[in-house]
Amino acid sequence: MDIKEIALGQIRDSIATKQKCIDSILGDITKAGEMVSKVLQSGNTVYLCGNGGSSCDASHIAAELVVRYKSGNERKALPALSLSGDSAVLTACSNDYGYEEIFARQIEAFGRKGDLLIGLSTSGNSKNVLLALEKAKTRGVKTISLLGGDGGRIKNLSDLDIIVPSKVTARIQESHILIGHILCSIVEYNLFKME
């Protein structure tokens, strides 16, 4: 095997995972797009959280909503925030309450009825994401989970689960950012009639 074959194998595996997404979760993705659109249209806020690569995806999606998704689409900023961005809050909460509480504590502080929390976890077992989703429920915050594998312990905790049909972390993360881009595209179409 040479490096070209390695690259080709990764690309083919990624394409196969995206095809499985079309076959099994397309309806859930469009439902999520409608949910995000309604929350933003009503003036509420979208929060996102995750760990590691999922944290990066959460920040990426939040940035696309605040700034814009498609180049050339001039529109107003939309209220979206990644809960991974404030190092002072993350370290203070980790020190005082434990790492598991870093997202739930922020939802307790900022989450309002009608807002939305999108939790990302490739395994579906991230304790801090799970606790944030549970806290969101107590605050009247709607919830969407982007998961992988069998959905883990987070499965069925949210108003809507989108479970990427793969057990490979890289394929799940690639699919999560694609789903995030689709959500942003649906939002720009629904709110601003931008394609």
UniProtKB/Swiss-Prot annotation:
<keyword id="KW-0963">Cytoplasm</keyword>
<dbReference type="InterPro" id="IPR001347">
    <property type="entry name" value="SIS_dom"/>
</dbReference>
<dbReference type="InterPro" id="IPR046348">
    <property type="entry name" value="SIS_dom_sf"/>
</dbReference>
<feature type="binding site">
    <location>
        <begin position="95"/>
        <end position="96"/>
    </location>
    <ligand>
        <name>substrate</name>
    </ligand>
</feature>
<dbReference type="GO" id="GO:0097367">
    <property type="term" value="F:carbohydrate derivative binding"/>
</dbReference>
<feature type="binding site">
    <location>
        <position position="181"/>
    </location>
    <ligand>
        <name>Zn(2+)</name>
    </ligand>
</feature>
<comment type="pathway">
    <text>Carbohydrate biosynthesis; D-glycero-D-manno-heptose 7-phosphate biosynthesis; D-glycero-alpha-D-manno-heptose 7-phosphate and D-glycero-beta-D-manno-heptose 7-phosphate from sedoheptulose 7-phosphate: step 1/1.</text>
</comment>
<feature type="binding site">
    <location>
        <begin position="51"/>
        <end position="53"/>
    </location>
    <ligand>
        <name>substrate</name>
    </ligand>
</feature>
<keyword id="KW-0862">Zinc</keyword>
<feature type="binding site">
    <location>
        <position position="126"/>
    </location>
    <ligand>
        <name>substrate</name>
    </ligand>
</feature>
<feature type="domain" description="SIS">
    <location>
        <begin position="36"/>
        <end position="195"/>
    </location>
</feature>
<feature type="binding site">
    <location>
        <position position="173"/>
    </location>
    <ligand>
        <name>Zn(2+)</name>
    </ligand>
</feature>
<comment type="function">
    <text>Catalyzes the isomerization of sedoheptulose 7-phosphate in D-glycero-D-manno-heptose 7-phosphate.</text>
</comment>
<dbReference type="InterPro" id="IPR004515">
    <property type="entry name" value="Phosphoheptose_Isoase"/>
</dbReference>
<feature type="binding site">
    <location>
        <begin position="121"/>
        <end position="123"/>
    </location>
    <ligand>
        <name>substrate</name>
    </ligand>
</feature>
<dbReference type="GO" id="GO:0005737">
    <property type="term" value="C:cytoplasm"/>
</dbReference>
<comment type="similarity">
    <text>Belongs to the SIS family. GmhA subfamily.</text>
</comment>
<keyword id="KW-0413">Isomerase</keyword>
<dbReference type="Pfam" id="PF13580">
    <property type="entry name" value="SIS_2"/>
</dbReference>
<feature type="binding site">
    <location>
        <position position="60"/>
    </location>
    <ligand>
        <name>Zn(2+)</name>
    </ligand>
</feature>
<dbReference type="InterPro" id="IPR050099">
    <property type="entry name" value="SIS_GmhA/DiaA_subfam"/>
</dbReference>
<dbReference type="GO" id="GO:0008270">
    <property type="term" value="F:zinc ion binding"/>
</dbReference>
<dbReference type="GO" id="GO:0005975">
    <property type="term" value="P:carbohydrate metabolic process"/>
</dbReference>
<feature type="binding site">
    <location>
        <position position="64"/>
    </location>
    <ligand>
        <name>Zn(2+)</name>
    </ligand>
</feature>
<dbReference type="InterPro" id="IPR035461">
    <property type="entry name" value="GmhA/DiaA"/>
</dbReference>
<keyword id="KW-0119">Carbohydrate metabolism</keyword>
<feature type="binding site">
    <location>
        <position position="173"/>
    </location>
    <ligand>
        <name>substrate</name>
    </ligand>
</feature>
<keyword id="KW-0479">Metal-binding</keyword>
<dbReference type="GO" id="GO:2001061">
    <property type="term" value="P:D-glycero-D-manno-heptose 7-phosphate biosynthetic process"/>
</dbReference>
<dbReference type="GO" id="GO:0008968">
    <property type="term" value="F:D-sedoheptulose 7-phosphate isomerase activity"/>
</dbReference>
<protein>
    <recommendedName>
        <fullName>Phosphoheptose isomerase</fullName>
        <ecNumber>5.3.1.28</ecNumber>
    </recommendedName>
</protein>
<feature type="binding site">
    <location>
        <position position="64"/>
    </location>
    <ligand>
        <name>substrate</name>
    </ligand>
</feature>
